Amino acid sequence: MNGPADGEVDYKKKYRNLKRKLKFLIYEHECFQEELRKAQRKLLKVSRDKSFLLDRLLQYENVDEDSSDSDATASSDNSETEGTPKLSDTPAPKRKRSPPMGGAPSPSSLSLPPSSGFPLQTSGAPSPYLSSLASPPYPPFPSDYLALQLPEPSPLRPKLEKRPRLPRKLKMAVGPPDCPVGGPLAFPARGSGASVGAALTPLPPPKMPPHTILSTVPQQMFSDAGSGDDALDGDDDLVIDIPE
């Protein structure tokens, strides 16, 4: 009976040992990961510093090359300016031409064989193409036109003068008078006797002529009896009321 019990105990111990080892391995793995992250950060920082230093070095090299090129051009200009008067002071020696020997043929006397493709033209008759190039089709510019010079623009633009602003005149609105039509006219009072005659009586309205009877009414309508010549002789009883 002790056999199976001992076996179970051994399995439990092995399980505990393995679990302890696994935890330790996980802890070591995390430590290594942290160290790896630190190393990567340092590497990134070093690479940035390297790129920055390379850029600065390239700028200094470009500046040195520009300065060396400018020095070389300045030295070449100085050498040219110094060498020109020396060359002008020393006259060039003249070479004496030897007379041609009678036995040696001159190059002008040698005649080239004519080519079979395109015959050469003689020097006496110029080609029409060359003559057209020699004489331009347009007339030359007149001397007066060439003598004219355009006015040079002034470097400073003329300043525009500001006109003084004139004071604006206020327009007063003219409206109808405030005094009532036909009412008493009131004036501001001044002095001790201001109340006397302060209000003036209104003017009496103008007299209108009396209404007149229309003059277009015929005279026959006003007569009580009609004349004998009228066409309406039988209408003697006709009465017309005229308002007075």
UniProtKB/Swiss-Prot annotation:
Composition-biased stretches (Low complexity): 99-135
Location in the cell: Nucleus
Stretches the record annotates as Disordered: 59-179
Main location: nucleus
GO CC term (a single one): nucleoplasm
SS bond list: none
Coiled-coil intervals: 10-54
Positions of crosslink type Glycyl lysine isopeptide (Lys-Gly) (interchain with G-Cter in SUMO2): K159, K171
A biological-process GO annotation: positive regulation of DNA-templated transcription
Keyword DNA repair applies: yes
InterPro entries recorded: INO80E (IPR026678), INO80E_N (IPR056515)
Keywords attached to this entry: Coiled coil, DNA damage, DNA recombination, DNA repair, Isopeptide bond, Nucleus, Transcription, Transcription regulation, Ubl conjugation
Top-level taxon: Eukaryota
Subunit structure, as described in the record: Component of the chromatin remodeling INO80 complex; specifically part of a complex module associated with the N-terminus of INO80.
PANTHER family: INO80 COMPLEX SUBUNIT E
Biological role stated in the UniProt entry: Putative regulatory component of the chromatin remodeling INO80 complex which is involved in transcriptional regulation, DNA replication and probably DNA repair.
Protein name (record): INO80 complex subunit E
Underlying gene: Ino80e
